[in-house]
Amino acid sequence: MRSATLLVPLLSASVGPASAQPAAESSVFRSIELRGGGSVTVRHGDAHRVTVIEGGTNRPIRTDGDRLVIDECSSDCRGGHRIRVEIVAPEIARLAVANGGRIELRGDFPSQSTVAASVSSGGMIDLRPLEAEQASASIDQGGRILVHARSTLSANVSNGGNVTYWGDPSILSSIRLGGVVEQGVSSDLARPIAEFDPQPPPLPALPSIKPPRRGGGH
């Protein structure tokens, strides 16, 4: 499978079926937003790099200020909804997911003073590899955030959702119309992300049905 690597800043980018819109020429991002589904993996590194691994034909990728935005499908979404992206960045200030999808951090990250995460209308963010002195996590209308905080954690959940945290921070939490803020067990700090977000089991095969026998004449 061919991938497209986007270096930030960019002058141009176009690589066959895995192409994506280039990020703005002179911007460096500190935050990442995923809108409308997909899978994003973030690793720590000295230079900013964005690589489209799969899909993305109709999924614009752009920068807006210090934000890297992976947008929803353009008007014609046939064959272009799914996207899988790998990102390298020296610092992550904020992650956001809206309308489904997942952003996860992998590998080693240096500790930071602050980090923030938000999920709206479904989705998942995994910040466990990054330990922050102060962290904030916000969920509205479903979703899940995994976060690692040392000193303080501000967690807000409304209309359902789950914030699971590691470390021993002071907690300032608000839950409206359902939701959970809970401490994770130490053995789950390195647990694979797929085990937190299991896929539904396949539907059982339908039993074969024999056609009814026609009654004979008398």
Describe the residue ranges of each PLM region.
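Intrinsically disordered, low-complexity terminal regions
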Residues: M1-L11, G16-H218
